[in-house]
A protein has these predicted regions:
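Conserved functional hotspots at enzyme active or ligand-binding sites that engage polyanionic ligands
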Residues: 1-109
């Protein structure tokens, strides 16, 4: 599991309860824990540009329809709640996600 990869997640609490894709946010160097920090996705078209980063489906990310990363729903789950690897975000999409997280957490200056 590497930062920027998309995995399926299910069986965790709250927003990761039903099966859905999730982006790995945790730094690759922090891998000795039994948990991992993720950002779950939704296909709900709710307009919230700062908190819902749209990700268009493509071959690299493995998504089959437009999804939105819910940066206001960052959570940590047990690694055994992750299913299979779906794909990986490209650099530009990761930069958009990182920027949205910085703003949401008040770290954007």
């Amino acid at each position: 599991m590497k930062r920027g990869e998309i995995w399926t997640v299910a069986g965790a609490k709250d927003y990761a309860g039903k099966p859905r894709p999730a982006l790995i946010l945790q730094d690759d160097r922090i891998d000795a824990t039994e948990s991992i920090t993720i950002c779950v996705m939704t296909t709900d078209p709710a307009e919230a540009p700062l908190f819902r980063v749209p990700i268009a489906p493509n071959e690299r990310n493995g998504l089959n329809r437009l999804s939105r990363l819910m940066v206001d729903k960052i959570t940590t789950v047990a690694k055994n709640k992750l299913g299979h690897r779906v794909g990986h975000l490209d650099v530009k999409d990761m930069e958009r996600v990182d920027q949205s997280i910085l703003i949401f957490l008040g770290l954007g200056g």
